[in-house]
Amino acid sequence: MELEDLYSFKIIDDPQISNDGKFIAYTQTVASKQYNNYRSKIVIYEIGTKKIIHEVTDDYKNCFPRWNINNELIYLNINKENNNYSIKLFELYKKNCKLVLEQETSISDIKISGCNNYISFLKYDDDYLNYDDDLKEEVLFLDRFSWKSDSLGFTGNSYNHLYVYDLKNSSLKKVTDGKYDISGYAWSNKGSNIAIVTNKSSTNDFERKKEIYYISNLNHSENNKITEFEEIRGNDISFSPNDDYLTVCGHDTKEYGHYGLQRIWLINIKEKKKICITENIDISFGDYSRNYDLKYFGGNDKIEWSRNGDEIYALSNEYGYIFLNKININTSKISRIFENKSVIYGYVFDEKEEKFITLEATSNDPANIFIYENGNRSKISGVNDELIGNLDLKEAEEVWFKNDGIDIVGWVNKGDKIFDNARPLILYNGGGPGGMRTNTFVFEYQYYAKRGFTVMNCNARGNYGHGEDYSLAIKGHWGDLDVSDNIAFLNNYLN
């Protein structure tokens, strides 16, 4: 296995099922060695024939596929060379593309309104403070604390805001404005109401707190604050089928910080009241896998409602794996949709809730799309199967051990070479902690194992997956208990 094998892997992301349940659209991304960039295409798969029927592709990135009610595909075309970000519409049956809207700066989180009359997205403002200054090549002027991001890079003094494009009138409107970021939002199922996740406090750069506002009129920026939470890490929000309730994942205990579990909350919009429906379920919900690799656009990991209004679907973080569940909002009864030994980091389903599409990774396969229907589960992609076979990539060994009387899980990618009568070993202690270390694909783990190094990593205390006490254990003991767990893992394996 060589480092350049990384260019041969295909990254699968963001599956979306059409409204009639007949088609799946997803992105497939490759790293181009020739052009030193990423290129993405949208693949359209027909469920009935089990065949790929079309690919939306060019020399750039085509991503964020979103189906409208007419089985047309709204998507984003990114041409960074020309600073062009175009929202386009692909007519499936005519195999025809139309330009809807162009922007000169990056946009994200594209959605279609429930009434189908609007397209929305998030976009960072221009950083005017550093726009025309003579010193801009030498000096960075800042008036906000959060001027960079681990995922986005440099954002400067910009704030992320919500824009809505009126398809009937061909007009674009900036819905929110001010010194705050919109971190998540959702359209109501009927009409054109929006719920947003933000923090409008003047000290928002220094707070984990998130607020939820309800926008009932797109022509007025005054919003109706519904409630707030001490933390919402995922920033995903959903309306109930009748639009009376919202669901989010988060916690409301300030002293827990980012160690608190992301529990599921039900919010009554009219009464502005919230209730935690998973208070007695010791699980964090959403995708919080933190050691994944070869994930580019990700997938839908938010709470989704059943059409009956009494149940929701949610991803759960448990002992290094992520499962898809159904939860009754009245009884809090939770049940898995199917059993799996993988990391599910995206899912969608059809309107009849008969077909469940999941995006999954394992320790020797970065991503595949599965369909679960009528009790049967099958893989519908497999773009890396031949490469995985040729490289002979092995699954990691799962190892359970104890430290301080606590059960901890870890994984080992075994190397098979001996150097000078010794077997070299690499122990990854992870970052954070926070989130959950999972039994998922990491290119460098496989690469080092092929080079003869045994590679180890574990879900030490401070992470999700083993309950809230486990996650809170290192609060005030950061660098102590988590390091102790890693060393105990090493000693246990060596012994």
Name each model feature, range by range.
Residues 9-24, 57-74, 104-122, 149-154, ...:
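Conserved beta-propeller blade repeats
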Residues 4-40:
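Beta-strand-rich domains and repeat architectures in extracellular enzymes and scaffolds
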Residues 39-40, 124-163, 210-211, 261-267, ...:
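Predominantly five- to eight-bladed beta-propeller fold
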Residues 83-117, 122-154, 159:
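Asp-box/WD-like beta-propeller blade repeats and closely related beta-sheet repeat scaffolds
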Residues 47-50, 91-95, 166-170, 216-220, ...:
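Short loop/turn segments that connect beta-strands within beta-propeller blades
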Residues 53-56, 98-101, 173-176, 223-227, ...:
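Beta-propeller fold detector
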Residues 283, 383-495:
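Cap/lid segment of the alpha/beta-hydrolase catalytic domain
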Residues 34-40, 80-85, 153-159, 204-210, ...:
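Short, solvent-exposed loop/turn segments at conserved positions within beta-propeller repeat blades
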